[in-house]
From Swiss-Prot:
Purpose: Catalyzes the NADPH-dependent reduction of N-acetyl-5-glutamyl phosphate to yield N-acetyl-L-glutamate 5-semialdehyde.
Major subcellular site: cytoplasm
Gene Ontology cellular component terms for the protein in this record: cytoplasm
The protein's annotated pathway: Amino-acid biosynthesis; L-arginine biosynthesis; N(2)-acetyl-L-ornithine from L-glutamate: step 3/4
Source species: Akkermansia muciniphila (strain ATCC BAA-835 / DSM 22959 / JCM 33894 / BCRC 81048 / CCUG 64013 / CIP 107961 / Muc)
Protein name (record): N-acetyl-gamma-glutamyl-phosphate reductase
Keyword Amino-acid biosynthesis: yes
Highest taxon of the lineage: Bacteria
PROSITE patterns: ARGC (PS01224)
Catalytic reaction list: N-acetyl-L-glutamate 5-semialdehyde + phosphate + NADP(+) = N-acetyl-L-glutamyl 5-phosphate + NADPH + H(+)
Length: 347
Protein backbone atom coordinates (compact mmCIF):
# COMPACT_ATOMS: atom_id res chain seq x y z
CA UNK A 1 0.00 0.00 0.00
CA UNK A 2 1.25 3.48 -0.85
CA UNK A 3 1.96 5.82 2.05
CA UNK A 4 0.94 9.47 2.19
CA UNK A 5 3.01 11.88 4.28
CA UNK A 6 0.75 13.59 6.80
CA UNK A 7 0.94 16.50 9.25
CA UNK A 8 -1.40 17.15 12.18
CA UNK A 9 -1.42 20.82 13.12
CA UNK A 10 -2.67 21.46 16.64
CA UNK A 11 -2.26 17.85 17.73
CA UNK A 12 -2.48 18.10 21.51
CA UNK A 13 -6.21 18.62 22.05
CA UNK A 14 -8.84 15.89 22.20
CA UNK A 15 -9.45 16.06 18.45
CA UNK A 16 -5.72 16.08 17.72
CA UNK A 17 -5.20 13.10 20.01
CA UNK A 18 -7.95 11.21 18.22
CA UNK A 19 -6.39 12.01 14.85
CA UNK A 20 -3.04 10.70 16.09
CA UNK A 21 -4.66 7.51 17.40
CA UNK A 22 -6.23 6.77 14.04
CA UNK A 23 -3.33 7.87 11.86
CA UNK A 24 -0.73 5.88 13.82
CA UNK A 25 -2.78 2.77 12.99
CA UNK A 26 -3.42 3.71 9.35
CA UNK A 27 -1.42 1.56 6.90
CA UNK A 28 -1.39 4.32 4.29
CA UNK A 29 -0.04 7.08 6.51
CA UNK A 30 3.46 8.20 7.33
CA UNK A 31 3.15 10.80 10.08
CA UNK A 32 5.86 13.40 9.45
CA UNK A 33 4.74 16.34 11.59
CA UNK A 34 2.65 16.98 14.71
CA UNK A 35 2.54 20.49 16.09
CA UNK A 36 1.92 21.80 19.59
CA UNK A 37 3.34 24.95 21.13
CA UNK A 38 2.83 23.58 24.63
CA UNK A 39 4.58 20.26 24.04
CA UNK A 40 7.21 21.19 21.44
CA UNK A 41 10.23 18.89 21.72
CA UNK A 42 8.39 16.06 23.48
CA UNK A 43 7.63 12.74 21.73
CA UNK A 44 4.00 11.81 21.15
CA UNK A 45 4.09 8.90 23.57
CA UNK A 46 5.37 11.08 26.40
CA UNK A 47 2.46 13.50 26.09
CA UNK A 48 -0.04 10.70 25.42
CA UNK A 49 1.23 7.60 27.27
CA UNK A 50 -1.37 5.44 25.54
CA UNK A 51 0.86 5.63 22.45
CA UNK A 52 3.93 4.20 24.20
CA UNK A 53 5.70 1.64 21.96
CA UNK A 54 3.28 2.29 19.09
CA UNK A 55 5.31 2.58 15.85
CA UNK A 56 5.71 6.23 14.93
CA UNK A 57 5.01 7.53 18.43
CA UNK A 58 8.61 8.68 18.84
CA UNK A 59 7.87 11.62 16.54
CA UNK A 60 8.41 14.84 18.48
CA UNK A 61 5.93 17.67 18.65
CA UNK A 62 7.16 20.86 17.00
CA UNK A 63 6.10 24.48 17.16
CA UNK A 64 6.18 24.82 13.40
CA UNK A 65 5.02 27.58 11.10
CA UNK A 66 3.51 26.95 7.68
CA UNK A 67 6.83 26.93 5.86
CA UNK A 68 8.35 24.41 8.28
CA UNK A 69 5.29 22.15 8.04
CA UNK A 70 5.48 22.14 4.25
CA UNK A 71 9.22 21.47 4.43
CA UNK A 72 8.57 18.13 6.19
CA UNK A 73 7.22 16.82 2.89
CA UNK A 74 3.65 16.62 4.15
CA UNK A 75 1.21 15.97 1.32
CA UNK A 76 -1.91 16.36 3.47
CA UNK A 77 -2.34 18.44 6.63
CA UNK A 78 -5.10 18.08 9.20
CA UNK A 79 -5.82 21.35 11.00
CA UNK A 80 -7.11 20.80 14.54
CA UNK A 81 -6.97 24.49 15.39
CA UNK A 82 -9.47 27.07 16.70
CA UNK A 83 -11.57 28.96 14.18
CA UNK A 84 -9.84 32.12 13.06
CA UNK A 85 -6.43 30.52 13.49
CA UNK A 86 -6.94 27.67 11.04
CA UNK A 87 -7.56 29.94 8.05
CA UNK A 88 -4.07 31.43 8.04
CA UNK A 89 -2.47 27.97 8.08
CA UNK A 90 -4.84 26.71 5.40
CA UNK A 91 -3.94 29.41 2.89
CA UNK A 92 -0.21 29.01 3.40
CA UNK A 93 -0.33 25.23 3.08
CA UNK A 94 -2.61 25.14 0.04
CA UNK A 95 -0.37 27.67 -1.72
CA UNK A 96 2.57 25.32 -1.08
CA UNK A 97 0.78 22.35 -2.63
CA UNK A 98 -0.34 20.69 0.60
CA UNK A 99 -3.94 19.46 0.62
CA UNK A 100 -5.80 20.52 3.75
CA UNK A 101 -8.52 18.97 5.89
CA UNK A 102 -9.69 21.65 8.30
CA UNK A 103 -11.56 20.58 11.43
CA UNK A 104 -12.34 24.14 12.54
CA UNK A 105 -15.37 26.13 11.42
CA UNK A 106 -13.40 28.46 9.17
CA UNK A 107 -14.41 26.93 5.83
CA UNK A 108 -17.73 25.22 6.54
CA UNK A 109 -19.98 28.10 5.58
CA UNK A 110 -20.80 29.46 2.13
CA UNK A 111 -21.47 33.04 3.22
CA UNK A 112 -18.89 35.41 4.75
CA UNK A 113 -21.78 37.38 6.25
CA UNK A 114 -23.16 34.33 8.05
CA UNK A 115 -19.65 33.49 9.28
CA UNK A 116 -19.28 36.96 10.76
CA UNK A 117 -22.77 36.78 12.30
CA UNK A 118 -22.05 33.52 14.10
CA UNK A 119 -18.32 33.78 14.80
CA UNK A 120 -18.01 37.49 15.50
CA UNK A 121 -15.24 38.40 13.06
CA UNK A 122 -14.94 38.95 9.31
CA UNK A 123 -13.81 35.86 7.46
CA UNK A 124 -10.03 36.01 6.86
CA UNK A 125 -9.99 34.33 3.43
CA UNK A 126 -13.23 34.47 1.47
CA UNK A 127 -11.63 33.16 -1.74
CA UNK A 128 -10.52 29.93 -0.08
CA UNK A 129 -13.87 29.80 1.72
CA UNK A 130 -15.63 29.57 -1.65
CA UNK A 131 -13.29 26.82 -2.84
CA UNK A 132 -13.62 24.59 0.23
CA UNK A 133 -15.74 21.44 0.05
CA UNK A 134 -18.04 20.65 2.97
CA UNK A 135 -16.68 17.27 3.98
CA UNK A 136 -19.70 15.13 4.79
CA UNK A 137 -18.43 11.98 3.05
CA UNK A 138 -21.79 10.25 2.66
CA UNK A 139 -23.00 13.12 0.47
CA UNK A 140 -19.87 14.71 -1.03
CA UNK A 141 -17.57 11.86 -2.06
CA UNK A 142 -16.81 13.08 -5.58
CA UNK A 143 -16.15 16.67 -4.50
CA UNK A 144 -13.98 15.52 -1.59
CA UNK A 145 -11.90 13.32 -3.89
CA UNK A 146 -10.91 16.34 -6.02
CA UNK A 147 -10.61 18.96 -3.28
CA UNK A 148 -7.56 20.95 -2.28
CA UNK A 149 -9.29 21.92 0.96
CA UNK A 150 -12.02 20.06 2.84
CA UNK A 151 -14.01 21.60 5.69
CA UNK A 152 -14.79 18.75 8.04
CA UNK A 153 -18.29 19.14 9.56
CA UNK A 154 -18.96 19.94 13.19
CA UNK A 155 -19.95 17.25 15.67
CA UNK A 156 -23.55 18.35 16.23
CA UNK A 157 -24.21 18.99 12.52
CA UNK A 158 -23.06 15.47 11.62
CA UNK A 159 -25.52 13.90 14.05
CA UNK A 160 -28.39 16.03 12.73
CA UNK A 161 -27.65 16.24 9.00
CA UNK A 162 -27.24 12.53 8.32
CA UNK A 163 -30.76 11.62 9.51
CA UNK A 164 -32.44 14.65 7.91
CA UNK A 165 -30.80 15.09 4.50
CA UNK A 166 -32.49 12.10 2.80
CA UNK A 167 -35.92 13.26 3.96
CA UNK A 168 -35.42 16.86 2.86
CA UNK A 169 -34.06 15.73 -0.50
CA UNK A 170 -37.26 13.72 -0.95
CA UNK A 171 -39.42 16.77 -0.15
CA UNK A 172 -41.01 15.08 2.85
CA UNK A 173 -40.53 17.68 5.60
CA UNK A 174 -41.79 21.19 6.26
CA UNK A 175 -38.79 23.53 6.06
CA UNK A 176 -39.79 25.79 8.96
CA UNK A 177 -40.84 23.23 11.56
CA UNK A 178 -37.75 21.28 12.62
CA UNK A 179 -36.60 20.93 16.23
CA UNK A 180 -33.35 19.28 17.37
CA UNK A 181 -32.20 18.64 20.93
CA UNK A 182 -28.72 17.20 21.35
CA UNK A 183 -26.55 16.15 24.27
CA UNK A 184 -22.75 16.09 24.03
CA UNK A 185 -20.00 14.70 26.22
CA UNK A 186 -17.63 17.09 27.96
CA UNK A 187 -14.80 16.46 25.48
CA UNK A 188 -16.78 18.55 23.00
CA UNK A 189 -15.77 21.64 24.96
CA UNK A 190 -12.08 20.96 24.36
CA UNK A 191 -9.09 20.15 26.53
CA UNK A 192 -8.52 23.58 28.03
CA UNK A 193 -8.71 24.08 31.79
CA UNK A 194 -12.03 25.69 32.70
CA UNK A 195 -13.99 25.82 35.97
CA UNK A 196 -17.35 24.90 34.36
CA UNK A 197 -15.69 21.78 32.91
CA UNK A 198 -14.18 20.50 36.16
CA UNK A 199 -15.39 17.05 37.24
CA UNK A 200 -17.35 18.32 40.25
CA UNK A 201 -19.08 20.91 38.07
CA UNK A 202 -20.03 18.54 35.23
CA UNK A 203 -20.71 15.32 37.11
CA UNK A 204 -24.37 14.68 37.98
CA UNK A 205 -25.30 17.72 35.89
CA UNK A 206 -27.30 18.09 32.69
CA UNK A 207 -27.97 21.51 31.19
CA UNK A 208 -28.54 23.40 27.96
CA UNK A 209 -26.07 25.93 26.59
CA UNK A 210 -25.57 28.09 23.52
CA UNK A 211 -29.26 29.04 23.55
CA UNK A 212 -30.88 30.08 21.24
CA UNK A 213 -28.22 30.36 18.53
CA UNK A 214 -25.37 27.90 18.90
CA UNK A 215 -22.69 28.40 16.24
CA UNK A 216 -23.32 25.02 14.66
CA UNK A 217 -26.86 26.10 13.77
CA UNK A 218 -25.44 28.06 10.85
CA UNK A 219 -23.98 25.05 9.05
CA UNK A 220 -26.95 22.81 9.89
CA UNK A 221 -29.41 25.24 8.30
CA UNK A 222 -27.08 25.80 5.35
CA UNK A 223 -26.74 22.13 4.48
CA UNK A 224 -30.41 21.32 5.07
CA UNK A 225 -31.36 24.22 2.80
CA UNK A 226 -29.11 22.80 0.08
CA UNK A 227 -30.79 19.41 0.50
CA UNK A 228 -34.32 20.82 0.49
CA UNK A 229 -33.83 23.30 -2.32
CA UNK A 230 -35.47 25.95 -0.12
CA UNK A 231 -34.61 27.79 3.08
CA UNK A 232 -34.77 25.60 6.17
CA UNK A 233 -35.14 27.27 9.57
CA UNK A 234 -34.88 25.17 12.71
CA UNK A 235 -34.63 25.28 16.48
CA UNK A 236 -31.50 23.66 17.91
CA UNK A 237 -30.72 23.27 21.61
CA UNK A 238 -27.46 21.58 22.66
CA UNK A 239 -26.90 20.17 26.15
CA UNK A 240 -23.82 19.20 28.13
CA UNK A 241 -24.05 15.68 29.54
CA UNK A 242 -21.71 14.10 32.13
CA UNK A 243 -19.90 11.62 29.88
CA UNK A 244 -16.49 11.84 28.23
CA UNK A 245 -17.57 11.38 24.62
CA UNK A 246 -20.74 10.90 22.65
CA UNK A 247 -23.56 12.88 21.08
CA UNK A 248 -27.20 11.86 21.15
CA UNK A 249 -29.60 13.89 19.01
CA UNK A 250 -33.38 13.72 18.92
CA UNK A 251 -34.89 15.55 15.97
CA UNK A 252 -38.55 16.08 15.18
CA UNK A 253 -39.95 17.50 11.95
CA UNK A 254 -43.44 18.02 10.59
CA UNK A 255 -44.40 15.97 7.54
CA UNK A 256 -45.55 17.92 4.48
CA UNK A 257 -49.13 17.53 3.34
CA UNK A 258 -49.35 14.63 0.90
CA UNK A 259 -46.02 13.08 1.93
CA UNK A 260 -45.96 9.49 3.19
CA UNK A 261 -44.37 9.17 6.65
CA UNK A 262 -44.17 5.42 6.18
CA UNK A 263 -41.44 5.97 3.58
CA UNK A 264 -38.89 7.23 6.14
CA UNK A 265 -37.24 3.84 6.56
CA UNK A 266 -37.04 3.26 2.81
CA UNK A 267 -35.53 6.69 2.15
CA UNK A 268 -32.86 6.18 4.80
CA UNK A 269 -32.04 2.71 3.50
CA UNK A 270 -31.74 3.95 -0.08
CA UNK A 271 -29.56 6.88 0.96
CA UNK A 272 -27.14 4.87 3.09
CA UNK A 273 -27.06 1.43 1.48
CA UNK A 274 -23.42 2.02 0.50
CA UNK A 275 -22.43 4.06 3.57
CA UNK A 276 -20.21 1.86 5.77
CA UNK A 277 -20.44 4.06 8.86
CA UNK A 278 -24.17 4.77 8.93
CA UNK A 279 -26.04 2.06 10.84
CA UNK A 280 -29.82 2.12 10.53
CA UNK A 281 -31.50 0.71 13.61
CA UNK A 282 -35.05 0.66 12.28
CA UNK A 283 -38.41 1.96 13.39
CA UNK A 284 -38.95 2.75 17.08
CA UNK A 285 -35.31 1.91 17.86
CA UNK A 286 -33.55 4.69 19.83
CA UNK A 287 -29.83 5.23 19.31
CA UNK A 288 -27.48 4.86 22.30
CA UNK A 289 -24.10 6.56 22.68
CA UNK A 290 -22.56 3.51 24.38
CA UNK A 291 -22.80 1.60 21.09
CA UNK A 292 -20.82 4.15 19.07
CA UNK A 293 -18.07 5.12 21.53
CA UNK A 294 -14.59 4.97 19.89
CA UNK A 295 -16.14 4.18 16.49
CA UNK A 296 -16.67 6.19 13.32
CA UNK A 297 -20.30 5.08 13.17
CA UNK A 298 -23.55 6.99 13.39
CA UNK A 299 -26.54 4.97 14.59
CA UNK A 300 -29.96 6.20 13.43
CA UNK A 301 -33.43 5.14 14.52
CA UNK A 302 -36.76 6.69 13.65
CA UNK A 303 -40.43 6.86 14.60
CA UNK A 304 -43.61 8.60 13.50
CA UNK A 305 -46.13 10.33 15.76
CA UNK A 306 -49.52 10.49 13.98
CA UNK A 307 -50.97 12.74 16.71
CA UNK A 308 -48.64 15.57 15.74
CA UNK A 309 -47.77 14.41 12.21
CA UNK A 310 -44.10 14.54 13.11
CA UNK A 311 -41.20 12.29 12.20
CA UNK A 312 -38.86 11.57 15.11
CA UNK A 313 -35.22 10.83 14.26
CA UNK A 314 -32.77 9.57 16.88
CA UNK A 315 -29.01 9.47 16.27
CA UNK A 316 -25.85 8.74 18.23
CA UNK A 317 -22.17 9.23 17.41
CA UNK A 318 -18.83 9.67 19.12
CA UNK A 319 -18.20 13.41 18.98
CA UNK A 320 -14.41 13.12 18.66
CA UNK A 321 -14.48 10.29 16.10
CA UNK A 322 -17.33 10.56 13.58
CA UNK A 323 -17.92 14.08 14.88
CA UNK A 324 -14.28 15.12 14.36
CA UNK A 325 -11.10 13.07 13.81
CA UNK A 326 -12.62 9.92 12.34
CA UNK A 327 -14.74 11.76 9.81
CA UNK A 328 -11.71 13.82 8.79
CA UNK A 329 -9.75 10.61 8.15
CA UNK A 330 -12.72 9.26 6.19
CA UNK A 331 -12.39 12.30 3.91
CA UNK A 332 -8.61 11.77 3.78
CA UNK A 333 -9.16 8.22 2.55
CA UNK A 334 -11.42 9.47 -0.22
CA UNK A 335 -8.97 12.23 -1.21
CA UNK A 336 -6.02 9.84 -1.39
CA UNK A 337 -7.73 6.90 -3.10
CA UNK A 338 -7.78 4.55 -0.12
CA UNK A 339 -10.75 2.42 0.85
CA UNK A 340 -13.09 4.73 2.75
CA UNK A 341 -12.87 2.55 5.86
CA UNK A 342 -9.07 2.27 6.01
CA UNK A 343 -7.82 2.77 9.57
CA UNK A 344 -11.33 3.32 10.90
CA UNK A 345 -12.60 -0.15 11.80
CA UNK A 346 -11.43 0.15 15.38
CA UNK A 347 -14.25 -1.01 17.66
Amino acid sequence: MKQVQVAVVGASGYTGQELLRILLNHRGVKLVCATSRQYAGQPLWEVFPRFRQVPGSGLKFTDSDVEAIAATGAEVAFLALPHGVAASYARGLVDRGVRVIDLSADFRLDSPDVYEEYYGNPHPDTALMQEAVYGLPEWRREEIARARIVASPGCYPTSILLPLIPLFRAGMLEPEDVVACSGSGVSGAGRKASIPLLFCECNESFHAYGVPKHRHLSEIEQELSHAAGETVVMSFTPHLIPVNTGICSTITAKVKKGADPESVGRLLEEAYAAAPFVRLLGRNQPADTKNVTRTNCVDIGWAYDPRTNRVILMSAEDNVVKGAGGQAVQSFNIMCGFDETEGLWVL
